[in-house]
């Protein structure tokens, strides 16, 4: 095969294959494990909660965020039909956190062990 043909094939072939996006690296056992859980639709405990759902949080009735830690990061994308870009907030035990974009209120509930975490 001539050098020109090889060069043209390299130009036409993407630098990655689509398999890159679907298969973990062969030396990454954790990635393979995560992929198997996703394929079988099994929830792994070490990933934590999937999504917090419920009513829009207000000062009188905030969204309760459970955690075995003293703070947790939550993502807010709005509510009540008015969505906004995702904003990430650190919710701590001391006081409720209010989203500056939509006004939704989040409050951390510290729990003593992993066995007490609610699943949504």
From Swiss-Prot:
Pathway: Energy metabolism; oxidative phosphorylation. It holds the Pfam family COX5B. One of its GO terms (cellular component) is mitochondrial inner membrane. The keyword Coiled coil does not apply. The modification Blocked amino end (Ser) is found at residue 2. One of its GO terms (molecular function) is metal ion binding. It is a peripheral membrane protein. Zn(2+) binds at residues 76, 84, 99, 102. It is found in: Mitochondrion inner membrane. Keywords: Membrane, Metal-binding, Mitochondrion, Mitochondrion inner membrane, Zinc. The keyword Ion transport does not apply. One of its GO terms (biological process) is response to bacterium. Belongs to the cytochrome c oxidase subunit 5B family. Component of the cytochrome c oxidase, the last enzyme in the mitochondrial electron transport chain which drives oxidative phosphorylation. The respiratory chain contains 3 multisubunit complexes succinate dehydrogenase (complex II, CII), ubiquinol-cytochrome c oxidoreductase (cytochrome b-c1 complex, complex III, CIII) and cytochrome c oxidase (complex IV, CIV), that cooperate to transfer electrons derived from NADH and succinate to molecular oxygen, creating an electrochemical gradient over the inner membrane that drives transmembrane transport and the ATP synthase. Component of the cytochrome c oxidase (complex IV, CIV), a multisubunit enzyme composed of a catalytic core of 3 subunits and several supernumerary subunits. The complex exists as a monomer or a dimer and forms supercomplexes (SCs) in the inner mitochondrial membrane with ubiquinol-cytochrome c oxidoreductase (cytochrome b-c1 complex, complex III, CIII). Slime mold cytochrome c oxidase consists of at least seven different polypeptides species, subunits I, II, III, IV, V, VI, and VIIe/s in order of MW. This is Cytochrome c oxidase subunit 5. It comes from Dictyostelium discoideum.
């Amino acid at each position: 095969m001539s050098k020109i043909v090889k060069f043209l094939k390299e130009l036409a072939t993407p630098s990655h294959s689509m398999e890159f996006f679907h298969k973990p690296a062969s030396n990454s056992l954790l990635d393979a494990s995560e992929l198997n859980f996703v394929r079988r639709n099994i929830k792994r405990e070490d990933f934590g909660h999937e999504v917090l759902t419920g009513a829009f949080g207000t000062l009188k009735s905030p969204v309760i965020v459970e955690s075995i830690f003293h703070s947790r990061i939550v993502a807010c994308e709005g509510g009540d039909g008015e969505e906004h870009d995702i904003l990430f907030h650190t919710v701590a035990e001391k006081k409720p956190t209010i989203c500056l974009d939509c006004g939704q209120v989040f409050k951390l509930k510290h729990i003593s062990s992993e066995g007490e975490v609610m699943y949504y």
